[in-house]
Swiss-Prot record:
InterPro entries assigned: Mtc
Compartment(s) where it occurs, according to its Swiss-Prot or TrEMBL record: Mitochondrion inner membrane
Any one annotated GO CC term: mitochondrial inner membrane
GO molecular function, one term: monoatomic ion transmembrane transporter activity
Function summary: Mitochondrial amino-acid transporter. Does not act as a serine transporter: not able to mediate transport of serine into mitochondria.
Membrane-spanning parts: 83-103, 141-161, 174-194, 230-250, 263-283
Classification via Pfam families: SFXNs
Keywords on record: Amino-acid transport, Membrane, Mitochondrion, Mitochondrion inner membrane, Transmembrane, Transmembrane helix, Transport
Deletion phenotype: Morpholino knockdown of the protein causes erythroid abnormality and global defects in respiratory-chain activity. Morphant embryos exhibit erythrocytes with enlarged nuclei containing open chromatin, consistent with maturation arrest. The nuclear/cytoplasmic ratio is increased nearly 3-fold. Anemia cannot be rescued neither by exogenous folate or vitamin B12 supplementation, nor by N-acetylcysteine treatment.
Name of the featured protein: Sideroflexin-4
Amino acid sequence: MDPNLQYWQNNGQSFLSRLGLWSKILDPTLLLSQAEIEEARTLIQNEENTPGKNDKVSNAWLLSLSSVHSDTGAVISPAYRPQVFLPISAPLVVGSLIAHKGIKSAMFWQFVLHTYCAGFNHANRNATATKDNKTTMKQSLLILGAVSYSTVTGALPQIILQRLRLISSLTQTICRSFLPVPLAAGLAAFNILVVRSEEAENGISLFDANGNAVGVSKEAGFKAVKETAISRATLFGTTAALPTFLMALLERAKFVQRNPRLIAPIGSMCTVITFGLMIPVSFSLFPQLGKIKKENLEKEFQSLDGNEELFYHRGL
């Protein structure tokens, strides 16, 4: 078991402990060079020889958790590390949720957002589901299909408004305020389910309480993908819903009615703030090192001696 997973096993089994950890891991200042990351990994691997826990060791753990893949031990591409998820994706989320004058611009923002999310989901997947941890041609085609489908479906409210110009005000309100919420949540979950589908099809590695690999399980793979899909749907669904609700209240305020141009920038600020606050919350909903009871696994695992639960890397 990778040192990162061992750390999560000892420190991330409650929601509050995970939330505290993610709040530190998501610090953009942790975006450091590969040499510094490798130095941090060497330090934590020799932690037993370090006299006590000091700030240097603590920072090394945060750097490892935020920059090194827990299955391969390889350094994650800088664009897909957790600490840059907010700076990169926040503008894309705002662009995907605001009203556009044309269909092309709406589809452009949807395409860029879902392309980045697909890359992030793939880079932070459980990499034990594929041989030599490499991306298969089938998976590449699935990712392309997921991005294409999400681009069109995400722009559906704008397509309806543009193509059906003579529609009631109620329909316009539904398309602009209500429809984007389930679409954002559903497409975020859909992206995870498709991009990481091979984990459920091929299975992922299981570990016992001592960190020893005991086999590969499709049931654990399905559970890992399902939990991450719920996490991502919570993130994007809340980000779409809460600012809409807040803006509906603010639009009644006199100062906003006197200055209608404030609505757009205030709405964008609400979206960014909500998204930023929800990232550590959504990442913390489920443990990075998940547990699954042997009775819920394949028969080959139910006869294993020892603990009643086994562990798996959930991915992000």
